Amino acid sequence: MAQHFSLGACDVVGFDLDHTLCRYNLPESARLIYNSFAQFLVKEKGYDEGLLTLTPEDWDFCCKGLALDLEDGTFIKLAADGTVLRASHGTKMMTPEALTEAFGKKEWRHCVSDKRCTSDKPGVSDIPCCSGKCYFYDNYFDLPGALLCARVVDSLTKQNRGQKTFDFWKDVVAGIQHNFKMSAFKENCGFFFPEIKRNLGKYVHRCPESVRKWLRQLKDAGKITMLITSSHSDYCKLLGSYILGEDFADLFDIVITNALKPGFFSHFPSQRPFYTLENDEEKDELPSLDKPGWYSQGNAAHLYELLKKMTSKPEPKVVYFGDSMHSDIFPAHHYTNWETVLILEELQGPEMEKPEEAEPLEKRGKYEAPMVKPLNTLSNKWGSYFIDSVSGRGRAEDSVVYTWSSKRISTYSTIAIPNIESIAELPLDYKFTRFSTNNSKMAGYYPLVHHTLGSQDTDSKIISTEK
């Protein structure tokens, strides 16, 4: 594979919507998502009302890349080899001694080193995958749910005097269905959509003009542009009109809503057909995709056949931008062999404030509300999303290891950027260095490597991905 990646070499450019083209005000959207689920659990399922009360400090628990053991309520931060770096029971962090006793240096019990989980490509099959008995929090929409679930575990443990196993996940899933079912936006039900409609500007950032111009530039350069989102069409229209303008759909040749990713990429056409839309409701099932337009559900195989026809090429080159490793990047890379650009807001540079550098509460104005830690900043409880330190491992001093999430980024992403704005003013033929260059773990970050990676003194600390 070539050392460099260029949009100019791509025939088709596709985008996710939420947290990719549409950037959210993370402190506000996190509170809204948390409250939407907490209200449901308390009011509909009878959970402790204490779940409705949060302090700013509570948000430090949130860190992308955590896994929840659905059986025992343990949250796990994994190393690249599937061993456990840090863990908590609910929100209560485990001590190093308890960590060693519970997990040792073995792969976590829900990790499976199995080529069927990843790929037969060299260098890929050594990434452990995880069973259906755990849930990974890999995006900002999910992340408030990690804090809520951890507090549920705390509450149930206290109520039941040390409860060891849990069955709350079914209620969390019911909360998702209640707030985000296909009819929720139209019916104005649940807690999320009614508030979003009332105060959209509080939660969502408009795209800068540079991004709108860049999308037009892609079309003017002859690229086919696509919007592929799991959001339903009515919510997509609300967001698209706000962030890009009323004519936002004209910026895309193909719009696919309710895409049900990652299944959009992995399912056979017979399992996931396309549907036409009428007044935001799904109508006719389509045996194939014959022309550009706006569709619902669907599959990557039929889409690719249409792209062949539109480009008059037997193998058009596609790149897809997304923020979720689980729903966007891994499946687009693994099942369709598309180029992938990961949106990683942790890379935002100057906007990235460490918690210890934040202004102390006592120095703030008397009536200024305490700030909620943005979800893309460093967690004191969990440390860096990208790396962590490990004692021993056969060495006389601590070693620094890559996390499971970090290794997946460098394996399945072509490049990673903080947001689309960061590349919108570059020429389309700009040559980005791929992650795959010399098997580098850091080459694909643009414009900057995250400070917890870039600041490593490799003369005094050893970056290790070994078991």
From Swiss-Prot:
Q: Which UniProt keywords apply?
A: Acetylation, Hydrolase, Magnesium, Metal-binding
**Which residues, renumbered to this chain, carry the PTM N6-acetyllysine?**
K181
Q: Top EC class per UniProt? A: hydrolase
Q: Give yes or no: UniProt keyword Protease.
A: no
Task: Establish whether keyword Protein transport is in the entry.
Answer: no
Q: Which domain of life is it from?
A: Eukaryota
Q: Where is the signal peptide?
A: none
A single GO molecular function term of this UniProt record: hydrolase activity
Task: Give residues annotated as binding Mg(2+).
Answer: D16, D18, D323
Q: What is its EC number?
A: 3.1.3.-
Residues in coiled coil: none
Family annotation (Pfam families): 5_nucleotid
Catalytic residues?
D16 (nucleophile), D18 (proton donor)
What family does this belong to? Belongs to the 5'(3')-deoxyribonucleotidase family.
Q: What is this protein called?
A: 5'-nucleotidase domain-containing protein 1
Specify the taxonomic lineage. Answer: Eukaryota, Metazoa, Chordata, Craniata, Vertebrata
Name the gene: Nt5dc1
